[in-house]
């Protein structure tokens, strides 16, 4: 049995800027600002400098799910580029992590990337 890939951490602004290849397994984070139950979609927002970045997430595989608007979430899933709406993460896991230290998570992602580069691995 083939297990899915564990998912590379990408920062939300990298996902929204189109820096993640189509079909990639990824992990990212953001504050849940909108949950559309009818379309099974969540919008996660993240602040980077003075800019707000959105990540759209399809929640069909993780429903039923209790959305807590304003709370911090981490999503694990596959990225699908769509012609009309940009990119959508098809969530396999969507976890509320309210209270997590975001600057520390961002630092850990940067440190992990640096470590993998030094070892000759990919991002």
Curated annotation (Swiss-Prot):
**The organism's place on the tree of life at top rank:** Eukaryota
Q: Name one GO cellular component term.
A: CST complex
Describe what happens upon changing residue 115 to A: 2.5-fold reduction in binding affinity for STN1
Subcellular localization, as worded in the UniProt entry: Nucleus; Chromosome, Telomere
Keywords for this entry? Chromosome, DNA-binding, Nucleus, Telomere
Q: Which Pfam families match?
A: Ten1_2
Which InterPro entries does this chain map to?
A: NA-bd_OB-fold, Ten1_animal_plant
Output one GO BP term.
negative regulation of telomere maintenance via telomerase
Gene3D superfamilies documented for this protein: Nucleic acid-binding proteins
Extract the GO molecular function terms from the UniProt entry: single-stranded DNA binding; telomerase inhibitor activity; telomeric DNA binding
Q: What is its main location?
A: nucleus
Quote the DNA-binding region ranges, renumbered to this chain: 2-123
Q: Which family does it belong to?
A: Belongs to the TEN1 family.
Q: Subunit composition?
A: Component of the CST complex, composed of TEN1/C17orf106, CTC1/C17orf68 and STN1; in the complex interacts directly with STN1.
Q: What does this protein do?
A: Component of the CST complex proposed to act as a specialized replication factor promoting DNA replication under conditions of replication stress or natural replication barriers such as the telomere duplex. The CST complex binds single-stranded DNA with high affinity in a sequence-independent manner, while isolated subunits bind DNA with low affinity by themselves. Initially the CST complex has been proposed to protect telomeres from DNA degradation. However, the CST complex has been shown to be involved in several aspects of telomere replication.
**What is this protein's record name?**
CST complex subunit TEN1
What gene name is given for the protein in this entry? TEN1
